[in-house]
């Protein structure tokens, strides 16, 4: 015997609450997953920001060492000049100071030189040093305009050897004397030997113009491609279109990555 229509309606009404209970459970589970995912993403973002801050602090320490080498060199050089040291005495002192500067900065390959009495004295003399028009060099002009402050140039191609270099320099505006360090790619390699990255993490160090100075990546790619990739990231950061709050990019291997960055006091 078939149940009456009223019985069917009562059974149907009993099934409705069960459906809504099931729906509520599903929604609760989805909201829980969404909330968990948001928490994980936020934790990942905070960790990325902390790492960027930590790496920037390490860069600042290296920058401080370079500044100290230049500042101390300038102070001692001016003291020697005030004591009327001869050119030979100045050159002997500078040779010793350059050796100590190399030890302090962790690499014998750092090119150190000075300008005294219109002459360049170098730790590793290059061809044409006696006729090199340093007064017209952008690094000298930039340092001269800084009125004795230490400057860091952007990366450029050295006229002496055709290699990429960053020059750290200070010039005494009265005498025109200068103390100079040239940082080549291997110097940045040495200073980052202890870099500890998270698994699959990538690290890029750029100058103020976005030129790549050092990198460590978990994938294989041509250096020129990496350089262009990083320049584009820097362009977006400077334009304000790439921020840490929502930055998500595809790297050269096709992997999705978050982007975290800090700018150091010298513009790196």
How should each PLM-predicted stretch be described?
Residues 177, 219-220, 224-268:
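Extracellular/periplasmic juxtamembrane segments that couple receptor/chemosensory ectodomains to their
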Residues 114-115, 158, 206:
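Hydrophobic alpha-helical segments, especially N-terminal targeting/anchoring helices
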Residues 90-105, 178-221:
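Solvent-exposed, extracytoplasmic
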Residues 46-149:
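Extracytoplasmic/periplasmic sensory segments of membrane signal-transduction proteins
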Residues 39, 106, 121-194, 249:
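Extracytoplasmic/periplasmic ligand-binding sensor regions of membrane-associated signaling proteins
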Residues 113-126, 165-169, 210-217, 260-261:
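Amphipathic coiled-coil signal-relay and dimerization helices
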């Amino acid at each position: 015997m078939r149940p009456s229509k009223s019985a069917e309606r009562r059974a149907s009404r009993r099934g409705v609450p069960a459906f809504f209970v099931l729906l509520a459970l599903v929604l609760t589970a989805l909201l829980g997953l969404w909330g968990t995912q948001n928490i994980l993403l936020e934790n990942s973002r905070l960790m990325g920001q902390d790492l960027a801050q930590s790496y920037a602090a390490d860069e600042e320490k290296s920058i401080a060492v370079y500044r100290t080498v230049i500042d101390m060199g300038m102070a001692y050089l001016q003291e020697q000049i005030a004591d009327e040291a001869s050119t030979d005495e100045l050159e002997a002192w500078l040779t010793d100071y350059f050796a100590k500067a190399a030890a302090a900065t962790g690499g014998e390959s750092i090119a150190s030189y000075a300008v005294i009495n219109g002459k360049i004295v170098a730790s590793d003399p290059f061809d044409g040093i006696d006729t090199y028009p340093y007064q017209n060099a952008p690094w000298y002009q930039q340092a001269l305009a800084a009125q004795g402050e230490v400057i860091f140039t952007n990366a450029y191609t050295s006229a002496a050897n055709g290699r990429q270099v960053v020059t750290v320099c200070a010039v005494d505006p009265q005498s025109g004397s200068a103390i100079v360090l040239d940082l080549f790619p291997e110097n940045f390699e040495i200073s980052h030997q202890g870099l500890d990255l998270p698994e699959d993490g990538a690290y890029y160090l750029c100058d103020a113009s976005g030129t790549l100075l050092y990198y460590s990546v978990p994938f294989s790619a041509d250096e020129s491609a990496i350089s262009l990739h990083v320049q584009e990231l820097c362009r977006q950061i400077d334009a304000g279109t790439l921020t840490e709050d929502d930055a998500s990019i595809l790297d050269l291997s096709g992997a999705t990555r978050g982007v975290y960055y800090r700018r150091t006091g010298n513009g790196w």
